[in-house]
Amino acid sequence: MNVIFISPHFPSHFFNFCARLKERGVNVLGIGDAPWDAIGAPCRNSLTEYRFIGDLHDYDAVYRAVADYIFRYGKIDYIESENEYWLDLDARIREDFNITTGPKTAETERMTHKSLMKKAYQDAGIPTARWTLPQSLEDALIFARDVGYPVVLKPDKGVGASNTGRADNSVELEIVWEKRDPNVQFIEEEYVPGHVETFDGITDSDRNVLFAASQIVPVSLMDAVNNGEDVVSYCQAPTPDLEEAGKQILKQFDTRNIFFHFEFFRLDRDKEGLGKKGTLLGLEVNMRAPGGRIPDKMNYAYDTDVYTIWADSLIYDKRFMSGEFKRYITHVGRKDSIGYAKSEEEIQARWGANVVEEFDVAPALVNEMGNHAWLLRADSLEERNEQVRDILQRKASV
């Protein structure tokens, strides 16, 4: 089997996808925008061969690299990146080289535009926040008057919470509108008073779920990015209603042999026009592995290896590795801009036995993950909550 992996070096832990394939005898052929010496020994060791291209947006260069791999290795079975940014590139390569596994360009359009994602949720019978694609400030103001403030404005196609703004009144909406890139289509949504819960997992070729877990995000990514808030997320087993909704979404897309990451809101209070407290609303779909250190959180929470489960799904179309939910795993990220009561040494003294990883975050991911972060294990909700309170306690104001 031959697999081309786009940008295997970023994020830094993604080499694990390549390593599990190579360990099973797969030729893993990398194409990336970092020189060979810069991608790190673990990544280098996970690859059969690597082609450095200074700019992966140079499609002619990428095309030539793929063609050369095919000339020397034969048929390519999969094109993968597990990275939202490169999904369109993955799809274009599949089309140009007639690689039948994985979505083509028409399908990735539905997977990368928020408006089309919401239509897919609605087709599956899952409600969403009301939304529009405003073509003018007047359109945006009319929508806000119809649904009520606050409203959220963000690119219809985009990764994470970048360029996302909230407006609590017409003056703020005008400011957010003027700050947007006029060459980019934005989507406007009513604000949802809730928190994010995800349904994440891996499928086989019949879109059966081989593995699933859930992330709970009490502080929205938008607030973490725009307001410099602390970053917290928990890994736990999916609730039954979340799992059922997630499986309905799997039927709406080409989700054969993929790692998926589906986002939902759960209402924290009743809201007219949306539902009662506890209602699930569709937010976004991501047809790739969840970002940050979520795959590693899954491994710790389930005593498993999701990279292996993913590799086995591609090669054997089965899951061999066991893994049941055992414990809560929490990502707690602190921002350098915030003064905290406890030092890192004090945190280690109290919670060291619970820390499974502690790390500095890559600069490109600081807004979403914090500057310095911990992954901690907890056997109960009470212990989990105490960890978060202790690590994020602020210094007393003078």
Q: Which residues does each predicted region cover?
A:
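Conserved ATP-binding module of the ATP-grasp superfamily
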Residues: 127-129, 146, 150-153, 162-198, ...
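Short amphipathic alpha-helical segments and helix-helix/interface helices
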Residues: 15-19, 118, 141, 177
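ATP-dependent carboxylate/phosphate-activation module, predominantly the ATP-grasp catalytic core
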Residues: 190-255, 259, 266, 270, ...
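A conserved helix-loop-beta module that forms one wall/lid of the active-site cleft
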Residues: 94-163
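ATP-binding N-terminal substructure of ATP-dependent carboxylate-amine bond-forming enzymes
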Residues: 1-104, 383-397
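Short acidic-hydrophobic, aromatic-tinged amphipathic segments that line or gate anion-handling sites
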Residues: 50-57, 132-136, 165-168
